[in-house]
Amino acid sequence: MKLICKLLSVLLCGFLLAGCAPKSESRTFFAMDTVMNLTVCGEEGLLDDLQARVQTLEKHLSVTDPQSEIYALNQNGSTRLSDDTRELLELALGFCRATDGALDITIYPALCAWGFTTDSYQVPDDDTLAALRETIDYTAVTLDGETASIPEGVMVDLGAVAKGYTALVLTRMLADAGVESALLDLGGNIQAIGENPEGRPWGVAVQDPFGEGYLGVLSVTDRAVVTSGGYERNFEQNGVIYHHILDPDTAAPADSGLCAVTVVGENGLTCDALSTALYVMGKDAALDFWRSREDFECILVESNGAVTVTEGLQDCFRAHVDAVTVAERG
């Protein structure tokens, strides 16, 4: 078995095309199983508070920390939740419903069976996959006030939305502090706040899933940019590559014809949740879903190399590839 694992600390390579002014402060640290970098312009002393908030959220939301609320829920079948965890769980279930289960926060047993939680990779047999499919059901999660409950065999994992929610929380903190310019890189989940100090949009490069270069550069202001791609974590067995984005309907890696999805919008949680869901849906269903909503734009990269950009990104995406199709709402 050959392991292929492209774990980029900055998934989108969210570099600054125009840097912060001299008063900027930056902090790099490890949390939520990734490297994070926070850059805040024009305001001193906030980085300690921001990092502490991230670490608190991690303690609540971790699926592996025996002290976390999610761990307690999975072990005991029921637990009381903090305000943060309750809010995120409620919002995550909303995205599960909105995407008709393309995002499912109960996928964790399948991730474990494939070895993506431990890096001990294996391909489950058909009987195992059939049994796993019976455990994937977000509708089995109940939330009654501060208490969450799940039946035996079901397990919750908020990993597909945790960094997006963290971006949302940090954005609120910065707004309360009056910060007008910042760039938050939460392991590739990028949140651009305001313009850069030179009065121009932040530049965020989108990774080319087929190589070391970039598909292009997004110029964004007050936007989140989140990518999900099968190239991020995968393994090869008997000549077949298996990636970590699982289809809840099959409990196996999604075979949707897509290899990367980038979602751009105001809300980091929305972008995080939908980057996974759209990948599972595939191009046609993803574009139909986009046409039904007004809160995001996206870039879809197919396994054959074709790139589709939704029309709302035409003016802010500078492509580095030749053939790009623009999807229209009409």
Predicted regions and their residues:
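Mature catalytic core of soluble alpha/beta enzymes
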Residues: 2-9, 14-330
